[in-house]
Amino acid sequence: MIVDYHMHLRDSKEELALETLTVDPFVEAAHAAGVDEIGFTEHGYYFKHLAPLWSVPYMTERCVYDIEPYVEAVVAARGRGLPVKLGLEVDYVPDREEETRELLAPYPWDYLLGSVHFIGELSVDGEEFLLADAVGVEEAWRLYFETLAAAARSGLFDSLSHPDLVKIFGLRVASFDYGPVVNAIADAGVAVEVSTAGLSKPVRELYPHPEFLAVCRARDVPVTLASDAHSPDVVGRDFDQALELLRAAGYETVTVFDQRRRRQEPLG
């Protein structure tokens, strides 16, 4: 089975498309790409419902959409028998775990993606307010993976998206011990996604790095597949490379989510 469990109805330069019909082009693109099931995971920080989690103006200013039409659009598509799952990409905000849990509780998620795009007021993947510029590359890596481990331990998330996002601009440390963060992920029973999105970023490689994935495999961390598509033409892009990476690491199954329960299906 092939899944693509990370995509957005909102193009980065367009308004959030909320009509149910906007789901269909993604489904059609998935079928053409040989993807069996897709999951929509809009950014939580676009929704007014999650605005209370943020304190910095450049984040609260993003929270302009109602969450209900998004949920209803995906649920309606699922009700029509389309192979879609309802997810949300949620930024982990330290010390706001219970509030996050309460804000997300009313909705029928199939799974929740945990992301770390921000450390305090600094950005992991945005050139403005870039974490690595402010604290240096080694400290940025340390802070990022400490926060990712905390996200795993929070119990909020079913899977972690682009798990080594801190490398996005190709800024690296000479060596890094992935053991502690992977141990936190494994102990929490959280999956990680293998994402092809990094191939179109300055780093020009998959998320996560093969060394990271090898440690995940050694700890039996389950995996999903992801394109991080913001438009239908990106669904399933470069999945041949993702599958090659997974098989090289020894993975034979992929994680499928339904109502926040998971099961393993043969990969491919």
Question: For each predicted feature, which ranges?
Answer:
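Active-site gating/metal-coordination segments in enzymes
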Residues: 76-123, 128
